[in-house]
């Protein structure tokens, strides 16, 4: 067996032993040893392999798989720009703490700087965005008088692979995230002609165990908090479970655990709490940001890892869990419950009275159609905010969204990855710009695994509706804002779906519920035409009703 093939097979075997079950592969020549090894593992039923053409979207496919599976996922690619295309996914994985392993095949390092084709200094390319950048080193000659000792190499290669897995899963840091595993490969890049399929490699540990076992670290920082003052909980992305805080009024973002005592984000301005407990990282609502920045309101930050958010610098203490004393007053709980009910009712009444279909109407229709066992994937920009405003019935529903750096890129691919890892129905709600941006993510080859049931709902207001609600949407900029911020595109979404052989229907918002109730297997797109010109007035009417 040649060196590159041997090395690749040992690495793949050890990755599987370390918990990798899904791998995304992008085609190339330099990563051929990895491709053959991964294909063998796929045929043996040890992994599920997903082959994609575009590394940028493939990275987000891996993120969707990793988030839904709560397990490390690898993406393998060839050298050169193939590696650079992983940049956006790596950044998202960093801030969302997703265990994404970038298996970047490389040329032998002596070829760097020589003008060799498809070669650049890719080891360390991702800089501070990865938990580690680890090189396996070039596999030496395994035959002849100067042959290296294969047992020694087996131990070294498996040990290095375990370091990659530990860094990605955060087993020793409580801070999962992306890792670059750079593997220089010398020709020959294909298995030897006389070699049997699958070949043989030196064994790993008995019983399928990892070469180097690393128990996950326990990260526990208790924080004393008195609940007697009027307290609200702000539950952001990655909030974690805190049963002893369940009684408190909670403004929960859609990706946070469902609150037992919800407080609508628009009701927060009227609540006037005396202190805040912040869980995870809030990413959505301006009333939340305003409250967290108020120096007169103490903020206590509880996170599940070593980092904590504090945009305004106002947090008084941090920890991982609250040790509570005291109890909220009945009057405070009653006040917040009334404010929440008033806000929920106001939103729904204003939606019913509004003459145009907007993204909020589409989000409400999707939210009302969800049922226990569903998985909901929300696009960045307006969809995730709309879902928070119309209110979700979160019991038994898993909600996903790329909130690490909150970009619109890769959302279709993320949804497909999440759907591939989910046994039930997945519904994705995204905007038209998000859809167009990642439309190549719809490409699933005829031999590839496909989602069991994925419906992508596209709220199409022909541009960036969120800018209607920001300063850029002020009427005084009306002569230029539509072009330079709204960016109308007039893309035929149905034609795009047809090109990728994806089932497509255009429907009205009030027909969404019935459409989502129909049993569906596979992947489809439902487009709902929406209006963004009236978004500003709709949101103003909701605030006025409060």
From Swiss-Prot:
The gene is menD. Its cofactor is Mg(2+); Mn(2+); thiamine diphosphate. It is an enzyme of class 2 (transferase). Its EC number is 2.2.1.9. This is 2-succinyl-5-enolpyruvyl-6-hydroxy-3-cyclohexene-1-carboxylate synthase. It comes from Mycolicibacterium smegmatis (strain ATCC 700084 / mc(2)155). One of its GO terms (molecular function) is magnesium ion binding. One of its GO terms (biological process) is menaquinone biosynthetic process. It holds the Pfam family TPP_enzyme_N. Belongs to the TPP enzyme family. MenD subfamily. Pathway: Quinol/quinone metabolism; 1,4-dihydroxy-2-naphthoate biosynthesis; 1,4-dihydroxy-2-naphthoate from chorismate: step 2/7; Quinol/quinone metabolism; menaquinone biosynthesis. It catalyses: isochorismate + 2-oxoglutarate + H(+) = 5-enolpyruvoyl-6-hydroxy-2-succinyl-cyclohex-3-ene-1-carboxylate + CO2. Catalyzes the thiamine diphosphate-dependent decarboxylation of 2-oxoglutarate and the subsequent addition of the resulting succinic semialdehyde-thiamine pyrophosphate anion to isochorismate to yield 2-succinyl-5-enolpyruvyl-6-hydroxy-3-cyclohexene-1-carboxylate (SEPHCHC). Homodimer. Keywords: Magnesium, Manganese, Menaquinone biosynthesis, Metal-binding, Thiamine pyrophosphate, Transferase. InterPro entries: MenaQ_synth_MenD (IPR004433), THDP-binding (IPR029061), Thiamin_PyroP_enz_TPP-bd_dom (IPR012001). It comes from the Bacteria. SUPFAM superfamilies: Thiamin diphosphate-binding fold (THDP-binding). Binds 1 thiamine pyrophosphate per subunit.
């Amino acid at each position: 067996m040649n060196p590159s093939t041997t090395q690749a097979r040992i690495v793949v075997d050890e990755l599987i032993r370390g918990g990798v079950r899904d791998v995304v592969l992008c085609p190339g020549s330099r990563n051929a040893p990895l491709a053959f090894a991964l294909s063998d593992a796929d045929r043996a039923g040890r992994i599920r392999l997903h082959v994609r053409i575009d590394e940028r979207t493939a990275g987000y496919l891996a993120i969707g798989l990793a988030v839904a599976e709560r397990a490390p996922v690898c993406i393998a690619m060839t050298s050169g720009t193939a590696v650079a295309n992983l940049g956006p996914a790596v950044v998202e994985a960093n801030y969302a703490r997703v265990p994404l392993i970038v298996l970047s095949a490389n040329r032998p390092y002596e070829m760097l700087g020589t003008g060799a084709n498809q070669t650049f200094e890719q080891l360390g390319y991702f800089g501070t965005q990865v938990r580690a950048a680890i090189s396996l080193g070039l596999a030496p000659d395994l035959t002849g008088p100067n042959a290296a000792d294969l047992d020694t190499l087996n131990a070294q290669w498996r040990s290095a692979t375990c370091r990659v897995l530990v860094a990605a899963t955060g087993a020793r840091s409580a801070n999962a995230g992306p890792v670059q595993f750079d593997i220089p490969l010398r020709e020959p890049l294909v298995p030897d002609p006389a070699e049997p399929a699958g070949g043989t490699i030196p064994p790993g540990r008995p019983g399928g165990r990892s070469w180097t076992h690393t128990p996950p670290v326990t990260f526990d920082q208790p924080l004393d908090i008195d609940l007697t003052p009027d307290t609200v909980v702000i539950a952001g992305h990655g909030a974690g479970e805190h049963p002893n805080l369940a009684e408190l009024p909670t403004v929960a973002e859609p990706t946070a655990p469902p609150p037992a005592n919800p407080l609508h984000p628009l009701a927060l301005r009227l609540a006037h709490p005396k202190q805040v407990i912040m869980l995870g990282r809030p990413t959505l609502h301006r009333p939340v940001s305003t409250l967290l920045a108020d120096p007169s309101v103490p903020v206590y930050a509880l996170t599940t890892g070593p980092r904590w958010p504090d945009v305004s610098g106002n947090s008084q203490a941090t920890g991982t869990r609250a040790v509570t004393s005291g109890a909220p007053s009945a009057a405070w709980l009653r006040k917040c419950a009334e404010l929440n009910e008033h806000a929920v009712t106001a939103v729904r009444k204003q939606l019913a009275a509004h003459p145009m279909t907007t993204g909020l109407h589409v989000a409400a229709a999707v939210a009302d159609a969800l049922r226990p066992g569903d998985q909901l994937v929300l696009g960045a920009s307006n969809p995730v905010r709309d879902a928070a405003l119309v209110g979700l019935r979160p019991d038994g529903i898993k909600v996903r969204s790329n909130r690490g750096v909150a970009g619109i890129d890769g959302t279709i691919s993320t949804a497909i990855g999440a759907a591939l890892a989910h046994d039930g129905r997945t519904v994705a709600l995204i905007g038209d710009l998000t859809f167009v941006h990642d439309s190549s993510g719809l490409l699933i080859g005829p031999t590839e695994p496909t989602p069991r049931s994925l419906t992508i709902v596209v709220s199409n207001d022909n541009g960036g509706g969120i800018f209607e609600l920001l300063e850029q949407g002020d009427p005084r900029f009306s002569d230029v804002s539509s072009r330079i911020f709204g960016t109308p595109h007039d893309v035929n979404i149905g034609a795009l779906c047809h090109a990728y052989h994806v089932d497509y229907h255009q429907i009205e918002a009030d027909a969404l519920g019935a459409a989502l109730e129909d049993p569906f297997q596979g992947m489809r797109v439902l487009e709902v035409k929406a209006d963004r010109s009236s978004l500003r007035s709709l949101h103003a009417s909701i605030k006025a009703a409060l």
